[in-house]
Amino acid sequence: MSQLFYKGEALLLPQTLHIRHLGQQDYQTVWHAMQAYTDNRGADSQDELWIVEHTPVFTQGQAGKSEHILNPGDIPVIQVDRGGQVTYHGPGQLVAYPLIDIKRAKLGVRQLVNHIEQSIIDMLSPYDIKAYAKTDAPGVYVDERKIASLGLRIRKGCSFHGLALNVDMDLAPFRRINPCGYAGLEMVQSKALNGPQSVVEAGDKLIDTFTKTLGYQEVIHHQGLAE
């Protein structure tokens, strides 16, 4: 985080968050891209938020146990390097990957998780959806049903992986797993709660609350991954 000095006092430069709109992508392409971005970051690298929908896939986090994958069928299962256990991604789900230099921002991992959860809660609140987080089970819930999942990885003081918000999707594949390691955990989506009706709508709302919660002063939008 760079500073200017004015009359001997340190002034914080406005922070910029770069938003990458990736459309629908297969999981591994985006996973490898965010690994590469994190590995190649320098002290002056910009923070980014990647917005994407994935083709159907189960991802198994580092804490995952095989017994929580009940019947994957024709949906691929990928072992990944994020925290947490197994979850499902598919069309109609908003996935957002915050690539944040948390060391530079002086953010702890728990603080970042809290900020992400609060961003989701705040975006749902105007729709009169009473969402909340749990201290013992990361994510966001509505009436004990899970609407958003979280799983992060920190490398070189920078975050990657992120959140998945159910918007307007087929929830049936969640029944092929124990979501996040919890047998019988019921999932819910925003469309059924009269919340955001599309991934585009949900993405726009999340970008707004995320930037406000994290304190970014400027947002720059990009289409697709960087060349």
From Swiss-Prot:
Amino-acid positions noted as binding substrate in the UniProt annotation, renumbered to this chain: R82, G83, G84, Q85, V86, T87, Y88, H89, S149, L150, G151, G162, L163, A164
Gene3D superfamilies: Bira Bifunctional Protein, Domain 2
Active-site feature positions: C180 (acyl-thioester intermediate)
UniProt subcellular location: Cytoplasm
Enzyme's top EC category: transferase
Lineage: superkingdom: Bacteria
Disulphide-bonded residues: none
A molecular-function term among this protein's GO annotations: lipoyl(octanoyl) transferase activity
Keyword Acyltransferase among record annotations: yes
Catalytic activity: octanoyl-[ACP] + L-lysyl-[protein] = N(6)-octanoyl-L-lysyl-[protein] + holo-[ACP] + H(+)
Site (Lowers pKa of active site Cys) location in chain: K146
Main localization, broad class: cytoplasm
Keywords: Acyltransferase, Cytoplasm, Transferase
Stretches assigned to the BPL/LPL catalytic domain: 43-218
EC numbers on record: 2.3.1.181
Function comment: Catalyzes the transfer of endogenously produced octanoic acid from octanoyl-acyl-carrier-protein onto the lipoyl domains of lipoate-dependent enzymes. Lipoyl-ACP can also act as a substrate although octanoyl-ACP is likely to be the physiological substrate.
PANTHER family reported for this sequence: LIPOYLTRANSFERASE 2, MITOCHONDRIAL-RELATED, OCTANOYLTRANSFERASE
Other noteworthy facts: In the reaction, the free carboxyl group of octanoic acid is attached via an amide linkage to the epsilon-amino group of a specific lysine residue of lipoyl domains of lipoate-dependent enzymes.
Family designation: Belongs to the LipB family.
Protein name (Swiss-Prot/TrEMBL): Octanoyltransferase
Taxonomic source organism: Shewanella denitrificans (strain OS217 / ATCC BAA-1090 / DSM 15013)
